[in-house]
Amino acid sequence: MRPGAGANPSLPDDLVEVGYVGGAYGVRGWIKVQPHGDAEALLHASTWWLKPAAGAPAVSSDWRVLPVGTSREHSGSVVAGSPAVPDRNVAEALRGCTVWVRRAEFPAPADDEFYWVDLIGSTVVNEQQETLGTVAGLIDNGAHQILRIVDEGGTERLVPFVEVYVKSVDVAGKHIVVDWGLDY
């Protein structure tokens, strides 16, 4: 379930999980966040929502709104300070929380780039207009991304998200055209 969809009426409907708190950074209450992917959304957002990890010690079960004062990249992580986290003990208590950002605060992607969250739920058809299914997720294999497409019967197809196979993407219309047969 998306965070704002009935989970808590005060949560925005467009929250996207972008990382998790790895622990405290320094002695002044900064936190260290491991991004799930590109750190741009974390660096661009002015507010983060923290959701406690299941079974996380010393953290309330409620979401926490965290205004971001300063953030920067540091050795593959993002470190950030917030007026809501005054010292290292408070920062350390947030370890394990997942970090969520409003989709509206993501920086605009380049013309030929897409956020995974925008592709999930898209209908995928081939060039013959045969429906392959719906994008259920994406996989990064190190060389490129792979669309995980599931049809109505539960059959899963994996289609490389590369130009040779992906012919068009309409993010607003949630529609992707691929050069991929039903029998692949």
Curated annotation (Swiss-Prot):
Single GO MF descriptor: ribosome binding
Pfam families in the cross-refs: PRC_RimM, RimM
Record bears the keyword Transcription regulation: no
Protein localization: Cytoplasm
Single GO BP term: ribosomal small subunit biogenesis
Record's keyword annotation contains Disulfide bond: no
Subunit structure: Binds ribosomal protein uS19.
Comment on protein domains: The PRC barrel domain binds ribosomal protein uS19.
PANTHER family: RIBOSOME MATURATION FACTOR RIMM
Protein name (Swiss-Prot/TrEMBL): Ribosome maturation factor RimM
Organism ancestry: Bacteria, Pseudomonadati, Pseudomonadota, Betaproteobacteria, Burkholderiales
Gene (name only): rimM
